[in-house]
Amino acid sequence: MKGLHPNTLTDLEFDHVLDQIVMFGHTEDGKKQISALRPIQGQKNIVTELKTVEEYKASFGSDQGIPAHGYDSLSRIHHHLGIENSLLELSDFKKIRHVCITTQSLVLFFKKYQEFYLELSRVSDQVVYRSEVVQSIDQVIDKYGQVKDQASEQLMVLRKSLLKVKGMINQSFVKALRHYAQLDYLDEIRETVVDNKRVLAIKAMHRKKVKGMVLGHSKTGSIVYIEPQQTIEFAQEFSQLVYLEAEEVKRLLKALTNLLRPYSSSLAAYEGYLTQMDVWHAKARYALTINGIRPIITDHRVLDLKQAYHPLLLASHRVDKKFTHPQDIILDAERRIIVISGPNAGGKSITLKTVGLLQLMIQSGLLIPVDPSSELCIFDRILTDIGDHQSIENHLSTYSYRLK
């Protein structure tokens, strides 16, 4: 299409159609692309898009249903991968892995069922899947999104030490608890937690008889909370090990980030592929709600709409449980003009909008609510001059609108 005036989109309420399609999108990038949909250039490309959406629509009632395609945006991750020596967050690797696995499942699916999805398979065949991305992530991160003990020998040693020292902390605390219980230094509650540390609940009169650090006291002052001295020594060792573990995890994640950095363009390609799948999915889902089909696209100068419905009116009437009347409209090389007459609010503007909107939809790769025997050609331009600029659901006549 050579040009499309913004008034045409407004007159035909094309954005209202897009708003309905957006509701079927699963991804933010997909929804953005749907909102920006405009007519496709070239008849061949239009037909290919219509066939693709038609295939996706057919999958909803098939035993070979297309796998899920949802994903979380990687835009922030792409930004960080473009910065030298940057470090991705642990959750970022889970998102990357999900995008890769989702892409792989779709690629394998379309290879297996190529005979059912010719157009979708052609697109899928162009995706170059790099299995080493997932393999690299799986060597470091487990299925729960945490760094594996086996990610490095150093990390395994540190985590074993952490478990050992943690056990020693518990043992030393229990030993102190029993000791001071025998001396009757403990209050009835015996112990509690202060600042994430187990402490002894010592009667205030015995506070100076207990070795350790005072971390607080009760509101009445009758109980003093003390961390036993031996527990403190092990806790200090534990804190040092936690620090060393965090540093080793950071080193591993930095190495993994650097390993994945060259694959940024591949990840962007996967994301683009999944976004396109989301657009086709939304188009197909919308087509189901309006009984949209792919009409005959002809090279001849013909516009032959049979049993054509205005999609917005159809949706509105469905909510109100009203019947929608279809229309038959034909224009060709010999019958280039139709004169429509009738009373106020008699449906003349609706007919104009039906023809214009369905043509705009078909050239944007959307299936339309018409009889399958309908024929449409492709136009270079779509021009409109419709007096009623109100939403079609308002049922305001052109005459009434201009009186306002």
Language-model features and meaning:
Residues 128-129, 134:
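Terminal transmembrane helical anchor/hairpin motif
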Residues 1-65, 81-91, 95-97, 104, ...:
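Alpha-helical coupling/stalk and coiled-coil linker elements that connect catalytic or binding modules
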